[in-house]
A protein has these predicted regions:
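Phosphate/diphosphate ligand-binding glycine-rich loop within oxidoreductases
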Residues: 49-125
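Phosphate-binding beta-alpha-beta segment of Rossmann-like dinucleotide-binding domains, i.e.
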Residues: 93, 99-145, 306-307, 311-319
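Glycine-rich Rossmann-fold phosphate-binding loop(s) that bind the pyrophosphate
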Residues: 151-152
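N-terminal Rossmann-fold NAD(P) dinucleotide-binding loop
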Residues: 155-156
Length: 324
């Protein structure tokens, strides 16, 4: 191969998406820089040592040891738990993530879930399967209360897309003093949370998984929800107590659930959630759209421009570390 590039894209794709479109998107946005794709492990080993910017799903310790010139690693995932973060930090490498790039697609999927419950589209499909032309009554979203737990990029995108449906929105976040786009906003304090849940028609979980949010929705919270309420989880499976959710669904304690994430995940083929008619299940595909690479390329291109303009690492977009 020729001289090392300015930006190296590692070979592993994500969510069924090949990396070639990512390379093309970066080249369009960085016309003055050499962007190369490492198609093989040998390419990665050959090009990494003198490349200042590497981007991809992950970087293993063996390759990192060889990446002497590495200044910035742009992770193609929102989560970075799989990265050798200590080794990256020790080498002074700036790490950014893909946080926010999935928000539009996930928010659209949330609306799809909610409207499926509102308009009883599952019942329509069942009658179609039976070739049964018999009317049934559905409802309207207008006048409903939608509660969103987590007001980051995904939660904010959900609220934005609910505008025009004439609904009341309640937001809950770890730092309610920051405010938010919802009509009301609370923290995760138990009393405040239950007050919100008692008035909720559709509960959307869009918060990160932390020690605070793990098991946040359990038996008590599900009992507070009205029986007509539906739960939508596009966050992380363990935010909901699965056994408690199963009990609520089986007893009609809540109307239904739409789950893009589960606990456990992947969901075993013999898990009872598969058999419940009042459950919508998708295999963690809420953010799986062709816009993944263009949005990620936008972030990386903006960050490289900022660095060229003299910005510090902490001024970059989606920076994971250094944090201060």
């Amino acid at each position: 191969m020729s001289l090392s590039p300015d930006v190296l894209v590692l070979r592993e794709g994500t969510e069924g998406l090949a990396t070639e479109p990512y390379v093309e998107a970066l080249r369009e946005r960085l016309p003055d820089q050499e962007v190369r794709l490492a198609r093989t492990p040998e390419d990665e080993r050959e090009l990494a040592p003198e490349t200042p910017v590497i981007t991809g799903v992950g970087i293993d310790t063996d390759l990192l040891v060889e990446a002497d010139a590495l200044r910035l690693f742009a992770c193609a995932f929102a989560g970075t738990e799989h990265l050798p973060t200590e080794a990256l930090a020790d080498r002074g490498v700036i790490v950014t993530n893909a946080g926010g790039i999935h928000a539009p697609g996930i928010a659209e999927q949330v609306l799809g879930y909610i409207l499926t419950f509102v308009r009883r589209l599952q019942e329509g499909q069942r009658r179609k399967d039976r070739r049964e032309w018999r009317h049934f009554q559905s409802a309207e979203l207008t006048g409903s209360t939608v509660t969103i737990l987590g007001l980051g990029s995904i939660g904010g995108a959900v609220v934005k897309r609910l505008q025009g449906f004439e609904v009341e929105t309640i937001g809950a976040r770890y730092t309610p003093e920051k405010g938010g786009p919802t009509d009301e906003i609370y923290g995760f304090d138990s009393t405040e949370l239950h007050d919100a849940l008692a008035r909720t028609d559709y509960l959307v979980l869009a918060c990160p998984l932390t020690e605070t949010t793990r098991g946040l929705i359990g038996t008590a919270e599900l009992r507070t929800l009205p029986p007509s309420a539906a739960l939508v989880n596009v966050a992380r499976g363990p935010i909901v107590d699965t056994d408690a959710l199963l009990a609520a669904l089986r007893s009609e304690g809540i109307r239904g659930a739409a789950l893009d994430v589960t606990d456990p995940e992947p969901l075993p083929t013999d898990h009872p959630l598969w058999n419940l008619d009042n459950v919508l299940l998708t295999p963690h595909t809420g953010g799986h759209t062709p816009m993944h690479w263009p949005r990620l390329a936008d972030i990386l291109a903006r960050n490289l421009t900022r660095l060229d303009d003299g910005a510090s690492a902490t001024e970059l977009e989606n920076v994971v570390f250094p944090s201060e």
